């Protein structure tokens, strides 16, 4: 079991504390099943966080076809490429707690103004509508949307993954995340500590 080594430094209060953002991976679902899940959870807008909004293996989730299907269910669609994955890791990365190069690259990208502006755009929609962030991967812990979830959590926003038509799962912040205000980083020191087998003990630093 990982020790919870999440550090939170100076989290600022925000009007977004009562806001909830849903997440979902389209995976290999039929479009009808996908729509039923969205409707069951009252989703009003899908925010597509794929870098490239198309799928050769699941063409029903290519941007144009998906947007048409959503319109029929009166659900809005927005692609925000600035939240997309596939970001290269920096040689001087401060996020070496991630052994996975893809996640480390996205964590590096999270330090940029482009990411912050794109996330703010997402939050502006979430203030008005129930949004669901959508990517391709079935489970969030294999997808960069889990890191987006960390960034939203740092801003006081509740994040829940759609699991079924009747159930969601609360997002768990990455155990080795270091949160300072709204900045999230993943230092190696915290990762090494969190991976050490021990009882789960939460630590918060103010």
Go through each PLM region and give its residues.
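Residues lining hydrophobic/aromatic ligand-binding pockets adjacent to catalytic sites
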Residues: 3-206
